[in-house]
Amino acid sequence: MCSSDLNAVIEALRAGTTIDKIFIQKGETDKTLGHIASTARAAGVVVVDADKRKLDFMSRTHAHQGVIALTSVREYVSVEDILNIAREKGENPLIVVCDEISDPHNLGAIIRTAECAGAHGVVIPKRRSAGLTSIVAKTSAGAVSYVPVARVPNIPALLEQLQKEGVWVFGTAAEGTSDLYSADLKGPAAIVIGSEGDGMTRLVREKCDFLVSIPMKGKISSLNASAAAAILLYEAVRQRLGQ
């Protein structure tokens, strides 16, 4: 949801409402906006300086007061919560890690596929990523209500945490060291999906245990992020059904 009223944003912060990001107009010296920014940062909310044109576009009606807050459609969980869900089911964890997926339609489609494939959760970064917005919820066809989503400040650190928990990390890359069908996805697995434009970031790539490629037989050399996620998830499903 999108809120552009000063008092509504202040009350949302005071109430502890889960806020994805707060956009504040560049150059504004209003004390209330300054208070919102400092309170939000203290609460761990991402604050973005934006020009008036961007805020006008986001608010549609141009009726913002120099601030727009994007609130989540549901609460985020912790990574430990996701691991515990797998433990309670007696299953090897299957987790999707999104590395800077900024397109909400892609994120929604990934969450939808994760739900259908029985993944235990999805992880996104706080910055340079779409959050659990209404667009993501709509694109997911309601899957955001069922798939636990964790939000972390640092994806490389997250991957190290998962590895310490015995989870193997599989990154997707056109120049992967092995093809998808040689990868063993039956064990505890985290599948990392990079952004559609740039793929995985360098630090994330370096933390992966395996880099796998999807065989491409046509003239186009890449798939969009949600399609790549679907292929890897259902290869994991196929392998696990055959155990």
Where are these regions (language model features)?
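Active-site helix-initiating loop/hinge in glycosyltransferases
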Residues: 5, 106, 222-224
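Active-site/ligand-binding-proximal alpha/beta "capping" segment
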Residues: 170-224
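Short basic, glycine-rich beta-strand/loop surfaces that mediate nucleic-acid
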Residues: 58-72, 143, 148, 152, ...
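Short beta->alpha connector loops at strand-helix junctions that form conserved
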Residues: 51, 72, 99, 125-126, ...
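N-terminal positively charged helical leader segments and presequences
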Residues: 1-85
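Structured adenosyl-cofactor binding patch, chiefly the S-adenosyl-L-methionine
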Residues: 10, 116, 138-143, 202-243
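RNA substrate-binding interface of SAM-dependent RNA methyltransferases
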Residues: 7, 11-18, 29, 34, ...
